[in-house]
Amino acid sequence: MPTLATTVNGLKLPNPFVIGSGPPGTNANVIGKAFDEGWGAVICKTVSLEADKVINVQPRYARLRSRDSGEIYGWENIELISDRSFDTWIKEFREVKQKYPEGILIASIMEEYNKNAWHEIVGRCEEAGVDAFELNMSCPHGLPERKMGAAMGENPDILEEVCGWVMQVAKRPVWAKMTPNVTHIEDPTRASLRAGCDGIAAINTIRSVLGVDLDTLRPEPTVEGYTTPGGYSCQAVMPIALRMCMEIATVIKREFPGRTLSGIGGIETGKDAAQFILLGADTVQVCTGVMKLGYDIVKPMQEELLAFMEKHKFNRLEDFKGHSVQYFTTHADLVKRQTEARAAKKAEHAKKMIRADAEWDGDDFVKQTDALARG
């Protein structure tokens, strides 16, 4: 029988489905709800030492719907990191670990360009019992104005330095969360892994403008008549996320074997998860999907992933992790392969043609005649 249980960076997860950082992990109550529903791990909403600087606005979401069915497939947010005090988070980390000692609790953390601040937040979170860290180097809105989030993640030199600060003191596994708002995601990936990070999480949201209201002529989501570009997620980003995960997995395999990848971007079903794992992910994160469909989607997701494994006779996630990466190549190689395949097919067809009268066979007379004909 196949199993979804897996061990990632020494963390034992009952399944690879992880609550991604955001509203679904915004306090102890909802984190507990996620564990009760059966999620493999939970990443809290990003925390910082100075939550008093975080001020959210309303509304802060805008959604894109199918013209035909009305289903939500695109989601923009201009939400910031947690506005709850760091002391409150430390208290709730302890409460969660006391109530769910086997639950894998991952702290998403973000700070300004300050070595002491990064050392402090890591040390205090570890004392509170968190099992791992995800470094939010990738939020595309609001925080970059303070040189945080994507402002760090877009600069490989700064990223490597800050990840290095964290690795100086961290005693738990560390994942660096990548911004997709770069030309080559391999560059920040290498920077994070050179600094010693245990894994990569990708992707965070894509900087975007969801649309403009044609009645008010104001862009969405509108706050007092104005807005700011936000982060785009949901089903629509999955093709971009898959491409970037494939690129990251290729870097890991070739240059940093043993490091891990947590795939993020539009995942709502077990089949979605299977695609990310086939392209090299060890775990998959779901955030917008939970906001759209609820915490209980983890059950059908597990069932669907197990059904996929049974169909292909895979017993463990490791049996198919990264399997499909091998089928990516260059366009020049595609042309070469197609040219060779057509030549081979033409040669095979030529073999079936009669070259001399002695080769005519009464049993295959019609087929032999057709082989010699055009049209």
Write out the residue ranges for each language-model feature.
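N-terminal capping/small domains of soluble enzymes
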Residues: M1-I106, M110-K115, H119-E120, M301, ...
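Short catalytic-loop micro-motif centered on adjacent basic/acidic residues
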Residues: F17-G20, L105-S108, V174-M178, S262-G263, ...
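Alpha/beta enzyme core
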Residues: G32-E37, A41, Q98-K99, E112-S262, ...
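Short secondary-structure boundary segments
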Residues: K45-V47, M137, N204, T288-G289
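C-terminal helical cap(s) of enzyme catalytic domains, especially alpha/beta-barrels
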Residues: A51-D68, V209-P229, M291-F314
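Helical hairpin unit composed of two closely spaced alpha helices linked by a short loop
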Residues: I252, L261-I264, Q285-C287, L293
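A glycine-rich phosphate-binding loop feature that marks nucleotide/adenosyl-phosphate handling sites
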Residues: G263-I264, D319-Y327
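Structured C-terminal cap/extension of enzyme domains
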Residues: Q275-V286, M291, D296-K299
